[in-house]
C-alpha cells in the first residue's frame, strides 16, 4: 500500500510512532516501555485531560507490539450497534499478518453506559485470544 504523506493531517504525520518518542513523565514512559518489553498488550484504561497523549500512547503501543488495531471514537459511535458490527467484524477474524489485534475506544466516557459498557465485558472475554 502506498501512502501519500501530503494528505496526512499535521498531527497525524508527526505523531510519535513509539513510546520512546512520546513526551511523558519518566514513571509513565517506564511503565509503557515495560509493556513493550513484555511483548504482550493487556487491557488498559488510559485517563487524563484532553491532549495529554492517551490516543498517541495507545497507537504507539500497538505499533511497537506489531498489533493490528481499529480505533472507535465513542463520542460518534458509542452505541451497542458499533460493538455488534464494526468491532465484532474486526475482532472475530484472525489477522492476515498473524498479528494480535487491539480495539482502541477513544473518548469512552461518551459510550452508552446502559448498553455498550455492560456488553463490553463479554465481548472482551469472547475475543481476547485474537
Regions found by a protein language model. Give the residues of each.
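P-loop/Walker A NTP-binding region and its immediately flanking N-terminal helices
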Residues: 1-130
